[in-house]
Amino acid sequence: MNVDIDTLVYLVPIAGIIGLIVAGVLTKWVMRKDTGTPEMKVIGDAIREGAMAYKTIAIISVIVAVLLVALDWRISIAFLIGAFFSSLSGYIGMRVSVSSNIRTASAARRSLNESLLTSFRGGAVSGLAVVVLSLLGVTGIFFLYLFMLNNDSDFESQSAWFSSTLNLVAGYAFGASFAALFAQLGGGIYTKAADVGADLVGKVEAGIPEDDPRN
């Protein structure tokens, strides 16, 4: 069966929108779960406060984007778009994850199946957010420069436009990877700090040795 390439191009943003809807439905389902005891809520709020720090990534991304203007202002904009969508997907995933972890712990008190379902759907939101926002970002750049091709005399041929679009996609990917790199480094440090803190609490307050399997 032959499929028109133009039809496939327009199916990409439609698939992205459907993915956002599914992620929204899963998020709503997870948020309906109870957050457990008051002590669990206190711990969950502390985790949420520390995990939502994205200010440093935004500042560094803007600095790099300014430097990229020397190459091409369009690549700089693509870099910012990539960094924005990467940070947005991380923000959505982190927000749902830190909200679902305490709900997963609360669900485990009632049923292991409910706990597994809560954690699975909470994690699915992160995966969907990454894929969907990547699709929408690349598609947005494609349609933007498709419009410029029809209204800008700088592109003398289809091949010139295609080459420029590839550079923009590279700039978009660089921005997305740049933001994701700092998010991963920050997340690793935060996770290790939480691990060490848990070991200290178990050792000092509960009297459990550091190498004990219970700690």
Language model features by range: what are they?
Residues N2-N215:
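Hydrophobic, small-residue-rich transmembrane alpha-helices and their short perimembrane loops
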